[in-house]
Amino acid sequence: MAKTRSPSTPPAPERVAAFQTGISAETRAAAFLMAKGYRILARRFKTPYGEIDIVAQRRKLIAFVEVKARARLDDAAYALTPRQQQRIIAAAEAWLVANPDHATYELRFDAMLVAPKRLPQHLPAAFDASP
């Protein structure tokens, strides 16, 4: 059985730090994408199936971007598991149901690797939705 904490118990400091690191990395990634000409359509889009860190558009392309923050870019590159990819794909399908006007756009699943004191590394088409 999964552990649950009471609503009055504050989260552990390491969880708070990880959350703040994630928010900071997503902000850096979004700024980097905007500098490359993307428009940010959504951040932290939550569904029952999973969450998409960033949904970005450039022309007729929609990019579903997973942001991975680690101490080193090499470590971040290996942090996107097949299970996470499936959850992101399912969440992207939910986003498209909620945003049908984008259904005819080209769709792509990207990764953005973020490490301290380094520019984010954008990996277009990091994975695809084919089985």
Curated annotation (Swiss-Prot):
Q: What is this protein called?
A: UPF0102 protein RPD_0400
Do you know which HAMAP family this protein is assigned to? Answer: UPF0102
What the entry lists under Pfam families is as follows:
UPF0102
Top-level taxon: Bacteria
Please list the GO terms describing molecular function. nucleic acid binding
Q: What family does the entry list?
A: Belongs to the UPF0102 family.
Which lineage is the organism of this entry classified under, starting from the top rank? Answer: Bacteria, Pseudomonadati, Pseudomonadota, Alphaproteobacteria, Hyphomicrobiales
| SUPFAM superfamilies with a match to the protein in the record | Restriction endonuclease-like
Which positions make up the signal peptide?
none
